[in-house]
Each structure stands twice: as C-alpha cells, then as structure tokens.
Amino acid sequence: AASELKPRFIALASSPIPYMNGTDFPAIAEVTEQDTGIPTFAVPTNGMHDYVRGAGMALEAIAEHFVLPKSHAEDVSNKNTEEKGRNRLVNLLGVTPLDFGPLDHAETMKRSLEQYGWQINSMWAMGDSLDQLSKSADAAVNVVVSSVGLRAAKVLQRKFGTPYVVGAPVGRFTEKLSEAMEAAVSGEKEDNVVYAACRMSAENLQDVNDTKESPSHRVEMTLIGEPVTMGSLAAAIELQYSRSVRV
C-alpha cells in the first residue's frame, strides 16, 4: 500500500488486543521505515481512553518529527505591526472536527484573532498541509484551543522555546486571550490557562460572590463538553452577560 499511495509518513496506531499482547509497534515502525523509506512512527493508543489522548499523541508526534527549525528569513508580518520587529505569527493547536465541527468554524477563530492584529501561521490540524505545519517554529506564540493541542504545545516549547497559552477565541474573551498572547510573546510570566485566570478575576458578575446562597443556587447555566472550549465559552458569557457559569 505504501508503494502505491506514497504517503508523506506512516503512523501506526494500536488497539486493545495488540496492546494487551505487548506488540512492539516502535520496532515495527522502524522496520517499516527501513523497508519503505517513508518516515514511520508509532502512536501508542490502546482504545481505552477518549479521543483527547489519541488525537493529542498524534499531534505530538507530528511536532516531534516534522516541525523544522525556525526560519531566519524576515517575517513579513513584522512590517505591518505598530511595534517594530514584533512577531504576530500564531499557531492554533487542537483544531479538530470533533471539537469544532466544519472548517468554517475554524476559519471564524482565525478571523477573530486577526481582528486583534494576529496572523495565523498554521492550524493543527484542519485546513493546513503538512508543509505548513512544518513551519510552526516560525510562530511567536501557540494557542491551545482544545485539550488535544496541549501535548504538541509542550513539544514546541521544549524544542523551539515557543510559549503557549490555553484558550479559544470566543466572543469578548478573545480580547483577554489576545492580551495573554502578547504577554507570552514579551516574556511576561502569566497563567497559561487564560480562560481559568479570566474567570477567577471576572469583575462583572452580578454580586455572585456576595450572595449567601449555596454555590449550586448561584450558577445560572451549566456547560458540558471539552474543557478548553467550554471554559473559554464560559469566560465569554461571564464577561459579556455577567451570568455565572459552571463547566
């Protein structure tokens, strides 16, 4: 199949039975790469966890194997920023159909950040090619928009020193996220999990902390779903509508 399709890489993912049998997928990957000449690696899934773990390990492997060192070429985006030499390139990590649905939703996130002067370098991994993902080291900051992207963010930080923040651009929360991205680029020490810090410091809640009612009675709505996207949505709701939200 590899000789016919000629893929850019081969990823070997496990399932419960091979996992319990102790199948040596890294060794199989090594032999496969030697035989085909195609980059091959194992993704140690076992069918016993949710999609966040498996998809996260897949993006982690892409970051480990295919992202090239930062280019020394002048970044065109720097010419368009108010502050000379400031890099406004950003990677969005964890953009999957399971969390964001159609590609149009991902494009909406891009436009939201572009309104604050950011330029999207790559989206992991909807709508971009492997070639574009390989240029991720050129970005000034990574934004983890879902839990799936966290592993890749840590790899890119370790290999290239790229800082990351956690949060999805939703409503009025996008401004807070942009501020955290700017702080990360400038080297300021801020809380990585932006939506959590934003919610804890929200000043627009209608006397939520002053009420004598129990916490269960204070909550006006509950969001159920992936932690980063739901946490970001909760922060946006609290900021815009002053309504307490539980995730």
What are these regions (language model features)?
Residues 1-247:
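An N-terminal assembly and electron-transfer interface module characteristic of large anaerobic redox
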